[in-house]
Amino acid sequence: MARGVNKVILVGTCGQDPEVRYLPNGNAVTNLSLATSEQWTDKQSGQKVEKTEWHRVSMFGKVAEIAGEYLRKGSQVYIEGKLQTREWEKDGIKRYTTEIVVDMQGTMQLLGGRPQGDAQQGQGGGGNYNQSAPRPQQSRPQQSAPQQSAPQQNYNQQPPQQRDSRPAPQQQAPQPAADFDSFDDDIPF
């Protein structure tokens, strides 16, 4: 029996500056409000209608620190996380909230460079802040994230590993083919 999949992908705009706090163990937690909008034409009136949905996002660990440092109100961001519901009691009443959690398996990617008014404006670019182990690069870009012309950087936080006294095995670079004339220049597209 399948265990199920809990994965949320959002591309949206920060509605306010992120709120960063630190747990007693020193880990960062960042909360932010992310707006996503969709637009369509009403068939009856012919007018454009826009609906904005607000999402609560909680980030943990290194990605939370980075979000607190670089995200501001109006920043566009790509988020990969999971849907999670919390329960607590306040004044004898049970309360619930559902939020998107970005933890060790989640990803945050800044889109569109720095927001206007930033002192270091013009450096542009974005970063892919991913706390999980590096994933193999794909030969084609993902279709769910908007394309950027600015360079991107990956910041990966790998889980701590035990140090080994043996040197890591060296991989040999692939050798180029010796006979370049054997390639067919007629590409079928």
Swiss-Prot record:
Chain intervals for the UniProt region annotation (Disordered): 110-189
Record-level GO BP terms: DNA recombination; DNA repair; DNA replication
Gene Ontology cellular-component terms listed: nucleoid
GO molecular function: single-stranded DNA binding
Record-linked InterPro entries: NA-bd_OB-fold, Primosome_PriB/ssb, ssDNA-bd
Skewed-composition ranges (Low complexity): 112-121, 130-179
Keyword tags: DNA damage, DNA recombination, DNA repair, DNA replication, DNA-binding
Domain SSB: start-end pairs: 5-109
Function as written in the Swiss-Prot or TrEMBL entry: Plays an important role in DNA replication, recombination and repair. Binds to ssDNA and to an array of partner proteins to recruit them to their sites of action during DNA metabolism.
Subunit structure: Homotetramer.
Entry protein name: Single-stranded DNA-binding protein
Organism of origin: Pseudomonas syringae pv. tomato (strain ATCC BAA-871 / DC3000)
